[in-house]
């Protein structure tokens, strides 16, 4: 019975073969991705970031391969709106700048696999508030298992969201990120914004988010 249930769940999502035939997911262009590593840059974007009611959210950490090694990440924190992605190379000053945003209950943060992120942020003295784990928002499709970002994009938009293991396991603590790292990190924060809006449009997310004063609305120009 358990095996049949898992198979039924799988059939509700596009197959790997189908996904390969879908058009490639279009993320933000490089000129809309801001890499931030100094407090002065934070001050330049403070107004636009702190007034955003919805933020896509993800983090990247330098991988650890040896037993007993301690994870010191996150080394990169990604936030995104519909228009821009912000990639923060973590320092004490940048964490202090981001702390009010992450602890603001009226700024919704959406993403995938955020349980470990919450643990890492707690170690840094930051309590994440109003965070929505999108992997668990597909019950209305008959899917009870967690759905990853790649399958979510395929299901909702019939697009292929590329995931590269070589990039995901690269050194995220390096001072100068490569262009593939920048594009990868931005997409991981931007995609959840689109997924959240589509789930909201389809009635899969309540318009009243607990512990906030927000009443979520779909963008007027959404077709």
Residue ranges and their predicted role:
Residues 1-55, 134, 202-212, 217-223:
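N-terminal accessory regions of nucleic-acid-interacting proteins
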Residues 34-43, 50-54, 64-187, 191-198:
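Conserved DEDDh/DEDDy metal-dependent 3′-5′ exonuclease domain
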């Amino acid at each position: 019975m358990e095996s049949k249930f898992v198979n039924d769940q799988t059939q509700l999502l596009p197959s790997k073969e189908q996904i390969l035939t879908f058009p490639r997911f279009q993320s933000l262009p490089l000129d809309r991705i801001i890499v931030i590593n100094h407090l002065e840059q934070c001050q330049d974007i403070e107004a636009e970031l702190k007034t955003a009611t919805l933020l896509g959210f993800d983090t990247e950490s330098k991988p650890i391969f040896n037993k007993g090694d301690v994870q010191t990440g996150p080394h990169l924190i990604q936030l995104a709106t519909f228009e821009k992605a912000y990639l923060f190379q973590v320092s004490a000053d940048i964490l202090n700048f981001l702390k009010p945003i992450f602890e603001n209950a009226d700024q919704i943060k959406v993403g995938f696999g955020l349980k470990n992120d919450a643990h890492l942020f707690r170690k840094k003295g930051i309590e994440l508030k109003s965070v929505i784990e999108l992997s668990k928002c597909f019950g209305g499709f008959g899917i009870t298992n967690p759905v990853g970002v790649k399958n979510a994009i395929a299901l909702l938009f019939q697009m292929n969201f590329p995931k590269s293991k070589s990039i995901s396991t690269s050194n995220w603590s390096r001072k100068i990120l490569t262009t593939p790292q920048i594009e990868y990190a931005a997409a991981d924060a931007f995609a959840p914004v689109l997924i959240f809006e589509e789930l909201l449009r389809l009635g899969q997310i309540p318009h009243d988010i607990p512990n906030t004063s927000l009443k979520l609305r779909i963008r007027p120009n959404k077709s």
